[in-house]
Design a protein with these regions (language model features):
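Carbohydrate-active catalytic/glycan-binding domains of CAZyme proteins
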Residues: 1-398
Length: 398
């Protein structure tokens, strides 16, 4: 778009380009439509807030030049004053949307009187035009918390699982600890416009779901405000971007990692900074055991595959062992803990090998349980994969 007489910029939308729907470019979410039946001229979509009150859709063939796809709002019940997004669910073959709402009060476009908790609402659609099954997102064993955004997406390595990275909003009020934070004078100046601009702090959370409505939300921050420095510990920072990218590690031949991004310096000058953050693939949470040990017994499960792999990390003295049991909890011959040599290292897909090898094809399709015994170790994920023969190892001293 042209800005101040020049097109040498990265601006995709300006108010004039969405004037027909009185669109707000500050409240948009662009996604590449993964629906295989999506027309080529609408491969990219943009969810945008407009008037009359609601969410509208833009479309584009290249993700750069957008046009209005709906001249009427497709979703009207919500606050929409933050991030609102949609995507194609490849497992359930439908679109799903998540948007900003409040649990009480009125936010209908005519009256702005929000109350209750800043919350997330969701719905599904076959065509992006008619949205059904609207519901507020629910949480298991998590107290009420103010969530500004949602950043929900299917995890690309396990698309049946939804992952979200909402920004948590906490108003700490005026206190000695708040006044000891960096940028005190700026904080006091912002508070003249609105007290919460000085007293609120935001950080990033992590949550997952298998149905898109009921989420397991970890109450501990996934992204903390970090070390004290100028411009930190403010309202608006630590908003994890929507999406993640698999990137090469900077550590030589180490495996790929995940890159996520978040803004910093939200109130510093006229622009914000973006920071890249990295973590191991699947490394969002882990089953962690101390040196004295700990264990996990899974629910009964049925698998398809020939080998069991672990995304795991241990200390030099740590270990993991795996036992396969039948549905009643009886260890299966050849797959007991005693049959499993200690596994140690740090890998994304270590094959579990018992004394007789790693072949589990004879158990495929049967109901089993897995027992994990850990010492000073983390287990991030496990997966059954197609069978590969055991490697031929050299014999020490030969």
């Amino acid at each position: 778009c042209e800005f101040e007489g020049s097109k040498k910029n990265n601006i995709i939308l300006i108010p004039e380009s969405v004037a027909a729907i009185k669109g707000d470019p500050a409240h948009t979410a662009v996604f590449k439509d993964a629906n295989p039946d999506c027309p080529a001229d609408a491969r990219y979509k943009c969810v945008i807030v407009g008037k009359p009150h609601g969410l509208y859709l833009l479309k584009s063939a290249d993700g750069i030049r957008f046009s209005v796809a709906t001249d009427k709002p497709v979703i009207t019940q919500g606050a929409f004053d933050s991030e609102n997004l949609a995507f194609w669910d490849p497992v359930r073959k439908e679109y799903r949307a998540y948007w900003r709402t409040f649990t009480a009060g009125t936010t209908d476009g005519k009256t702005w009187a929000p109350a209750g908790i800043r919350a997330i609402r969701t719905a599904t659609s076959k065509d992006l035009l008619t949205w059904d099954s609207q519901a507020d997102v629910e949480y298991v064993d998590s107290p009420p918390q103010q969530l500004y955004t949602n950043q929900i997406q299917p995890y690309y390595r396990a698309p049946h699982i939804f992952m979200g990275f909402p920004m948590r909003y906490t108003d700490r009020g005026w206190s000695e600890s708040l006044m000891a934070l960096p940028g005190r004078e700026d904080r006091l100046a912002r508070a003249k416009a609105s007290p919460r601009y000085g007293t609120a702090i935001t950080d990033g959370l992590f949550m997952t779901s298998r149905d898109g409505v009921q989420f397991r939300r970890w109450n501990e921050a996934f992204l903390r405000p970090g070390p004290r420095r100028q411009g930190s510990w403010v309202y608006g920072d630590n908003l994890i971007f929507w999406g993640m990218v698999e990137t090469a590690s900077t550590l030589g031949d180490a495996p790929n990692e995940l890159s996520i991004y978040a803004p910093e310096d939200y109130w510093q000058g006229e622009a914000v900074s973006f920071r890249r953050l990295t973590l191991r693939i699947d490394g969002f949470v882990s089953l962690r055991a101390p040196a004295q040990g700990g264990e996990l017994l899974t629910k009964p499960l049925v698998f398809d595959g020939g080998n069991l792999t672990l995304n795991m990390a241990t200390s030099g003295a740590g270990s993991i062992q795996v036992e396969i049991q039948d549905a009643a909890g009886k260890p299966l011959p050849g797959y007991t803990l005693a049959d499993c040599p200690e596994i140690f290292g740090d890998e994304l897909a270590r094959v579990v090998r018992w004394r007789k090898g790693g072949d589990v094809r004879s158990l495929s399709g049967k109901t089993v349980r897995l027992r994990f015994l850990l010492h000073d170790a983390d287990l991030y994920a496990f997966q059954f994969v197609p069978y590969q023969p055991d490697p031929v190892r050299p014999r020490p001293g030969k």
